[in-house]
């Protein structure tokens, strides 16, 4: 692809940014990306700054930031708000660690249930199904 990333149509822009056209339009509706003026009788054009912005959004998404959080990061992107950006990242890191702990607990329980399923003999009820039914019963009895 050419290195000239100026004066791009939306299709070429989307390809350069590694997304599809609908993603570009979605980001515009969400306020993450500007919608360029449409010259009379012509089509909108995008430039390198737009490509960089979309790549920023995608990078932030890969780190788990929501679109609202990304909008806040974009607001801070002049490089002078490192403390605020760091605070956002610390909150995200806390969320990630909590999710990892939840996943570890889920893995332990599932592993135990799989072992119990493999260890069962005869026509005994499936430990996994019994456990899930027990949880469902507890949830029903807790309802008002």
From Swiss-Prot:
<feature type="binding site">
    <location>
        <position position="126"/>
    </location>
    <ligand>
        <name>Hg(2+)</name>
    </ligand>
</feature>
<dbReference type="GO" id="GO:0003700">
    <property type="term" value="F:DNA-binding transcription factor activity"/>
</dbReference>
<keyword id="KW-0475">Mercuric resistance</keyword>
<dbReference type="GO" id="GO:0003677">
    <property type="term" value="F:DNA binding"/>
</dbReference>
<dbReference type="Pfam" id="PF00376">
    <property type="entry name" value="MerR"/>
</dbReference>
<keyword id="KW-0678">Repressor</keyword>
<feature type="DNA-binding region" description="H-T-H motif">
    <location>
        <begin position="10"/>
        <end position="29"/>
    </location>
</feature>
<keyword id="KW-0805">Transcription regulation</keyword>
<keyword id="KW-0476">Mercury</keyword>
<dbReference type="GO" id="GO:0046689">
    <property type="term" value="P:response to mercury ion"/>
</dbReference>
<dbReference type="InterPro" id="IPR047057">
    <property type="entry name" value="MerR_fam"/>
</dbReference>
<feature type="binding site">
    <location>
        <position position="82"/>
    </location>
    <ligand>
        <name>Hg(2+)</name>
    </ligand>
</feature>
<dbReference type="InterPro" id="IPR000551">
    <property type="entry name" value="MerR-type_HTH_dom"/>
</dbReference>
<feature type="domain" description="HTH merR-type">
    <location>
        <begin position="7"/>
        <end position="76"/>
    </location>
</feature>
<dbReference type="InterPro" id="IPR009061">
    <property type="entry name" value="DNA-bd_dom_put_sf"/>
</dbReference>
<keyword id="KW-0814">Transposable element</keyword>
<dbReference type="InterPro" id="IPR015358">
    <property type="entry name" value="Tscrpt_reg_MerR_DNA-bd"/>
</dbReference>
<feature type="binding site">
    <location>
        <position position="117"/>
    </location>
    <ligand>
        <name>Hg(2+)</name>
    </ligand>
</feature>
<comment type="function">
    <text>Mediates the mercuric-dependent induction of mercury resistance operon. In the absence of mercury MerR represses transcription by binding tightly to the mer operator region; when mercury is present the dimeric complex binds a single ion and becomes a potent transcriptional activator, while remaining bound to the mer site.</text>
</comment>
<protein>
    <recommendedName>
        <fullName>Mercuric resistance operon regulatory protein</fullName>
    </recommendedName>
</protein>
<dbReference type="GO" id="GO:0045340">
    <property type="term" value="F:mercury ion binding"/>
</dbReference>
<keyword id="KW-0238">DNA-binding</keyword>
<keyword id="KW-0479">Metal-binding</keyword>
<keyword id="KW-0614">Plasmid</keyword>
<dbReference type="InterPro" id="IPR011794">
    <property type="entry name" value="MerR"/>
</dbReference>
<dbReference type="Pfam" id="PF09278">
    <property type="entry name" value="MerR-DNA-bind"/>
</dbReference>
<keyword id="KW-0804">Transcription</keyword>
<keyword id="KW-0010">Activator</keyword>
């Amino acid at each position: 692809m050419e290195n000239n990333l100026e004066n791009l149509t939306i299709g070429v822009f989307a390809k350069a940014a590694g997304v599809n056209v609908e993603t570009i339009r979605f980001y515009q509706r969400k306020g993450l990306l500007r919608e360029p003026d449409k010259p009379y009788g012509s089509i909108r054009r995008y430039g390198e700054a737009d490509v960089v912005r979309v790549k920023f959004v995608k990078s932030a998404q890969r780190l788990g930031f929501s679109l609202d959080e990304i909008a806040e990061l974009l607001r801070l992107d002049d490089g002078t708000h490192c403390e605020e950006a760091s605070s956002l990242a610390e909150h995200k890191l806390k969320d990630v660690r909590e999710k990892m702990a939840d996943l570890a607990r889920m893995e332990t329980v599932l592993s135990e249930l799989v072992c119990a399923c493999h260890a069962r003999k005869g026509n005994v009820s499936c430990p996994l199904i019994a456990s899930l039914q027990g949880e469902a019963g507890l949830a029903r009895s807790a309802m008002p």
